[in-house]
UniProtKB/Swiss-Prot annotation:
HAMAP family, A to Z: 16SrRNA_methyltr_H
Annotated S-adenosyl-L-methionine binding sites: A33, G34, H35, D53, F80, D101, Q108
Organism whose genome encodes this protein: Alkaliphilus oremlandii (strain OhILAs)
Record protein name field: Ribosomal RNA small subunit methyltransferase H
MF GO annotations: rRNA (cytosine-N4-)-methyltransferase activity
GO biological process, one term: rRNA base methylation
Compartmental location: Cytoplasm
Stretches assigned to coiled coil: none
Gene3D superfamilies in alphabetical order: Putative methyltransferase TM0872, insert domain, Vaccinia Virus protein VP39
Gene Ontology annotations for the cellular component aspect, listed alphabetically: cytoplasm
Keyword rRNA processing part of the UniProt annotation: yes
Length: 311
């Protein structure tokens, strides 16, 4: 199966995982297995890579790509937020590193019938896991106007959220919005012409917001980080790639809280709560793609990598 996906910040991720040849590593967002194949190459027969993805196509494609190294790889179709249960089922007590590449993959964007992209006309879907019930079509056609406004404003950081939500609700009174290009047309009508001249595609932020809502992307990040860190062996690292400011802010704050968990009032001269740091932050500032990488893969432009190490 052809699963086209260019791995972002590949060398930087591999370097920061500090891979030990006999270690156990998790790629929580398997995708096209670009990161996974490089991790697996560095493992001995005693090492193990666990590749997780909720996308059935990703699992199938990765299985084919990783066949030469299959003895040191286990693939799991699940959401990385279930890392605790996944490791328990595999009877694994601790891991030496975990990588999360958040957001939608290049393959999912390019696979027109998945409905992730505003560039292709397709059924409104946007489900990363096609087994789940709620799709973008349900969100767009059944959520209240206020709920749509909040989603588009909070998850898309879209200044025209109120107008877009209003236009969506008005349109669906006449007929349901069932395709991506229908939704794009509604969004374009909602945003004043002058505001559409500069900047990204007018539908970009709204599509991002709806995708995040459909897949519960932001809700699971904090829980996943806590669970992942708890399962890391001392010295093990967690590497997370984000693609927009909402994700990056959550990761940054989660790492900060885990590295400085003191809950004492600020007026206390010394810590009395005795809460110990769980990690040390490796990247005080996020790692971003080089100009060379951006020339090869413009979609990497907004990527940021943050790394923390279990104490």
């Amino acid at each position: 199966m052809d699963f086209k996906h260019v791995s972002v910040l590949l060398e930087e991720c591999i370097e920061n995982l500090n891979i030990k040849e006999n270690g156990i590593y998790v790629d929580g967002t398997l995708g096209g297995a670009g990161h996974s194949s490089e991790i697996a190459k560095r493992l001995s027969d005693k090492g193990l890579l666990i590749g997780i993805d909720q996308d059935e196509n990703a699992i199938k494609a990765a299985g084919e790509k990783l066949t030469p190294m299959k003895e040191r790889i286990k693939l799991v179709r699940d959401n990385f937020s279930n890392i605790d249960a996944i490791l328990q089922n595999l009877e694994i007590d601790g891991i030496d590193g975990i990588l999360l590449d958040l957001g939608v993959s290049s393959h999912q964007l390019d696979e027109a019938d998945r409905g992730f992209s505003y560039m292709h006309d397709a059924p409104l879907d946007m489900r990363m896991d096609t087994r789940q019930a709620v799709s973008a079509m349900e969100v767009v056609n059944s959520y209240t106007e206020k709920d749509l406004e909040n989603i588009i404003k909070n998850y898309g950081e879209e200044k025209w959220a109120k107008r877009i939500a209003n236009f969506i609700v008005d349109f669906r009174k006449e007929e349901p919005i069932t395709t991506t290009h229908q939704l794009v047309d509604v969004i374009k009508r909602a945003i004043p012409k002058g505001a559409r001249i500069d900047g990204p595609h007018p539908a970009k932020r709204t599509f991002q917001a709806i995708r995040i809502e459909v897949n519960g992307e932001l809700e699971i990040i904090n829980k996943t980080i806590d669970d992942a860190v708890r399962n890391l062996n001392p010295g093990g690292r967690i590497c997370i790639i984000t693609f927009h400011s909402l994700e990056d802010r959550i990761v940054k704050n989660a790492f900060r809280d885990l590295s400085n968990p003191c809950i004492c009032p600020p007026e206390f001269p010394i810590c009395r709560c005795d809460r110990k740091p769980a990690v040390k932050i490796i990247t005080r500032k996020p790692i971003v793609p080089t100009e060379e990488e951006l020339e090869l893969n413009p979609r990497a432009r907004s990527a940021k990598l943050r790394v923390a190490e279990k104490i």
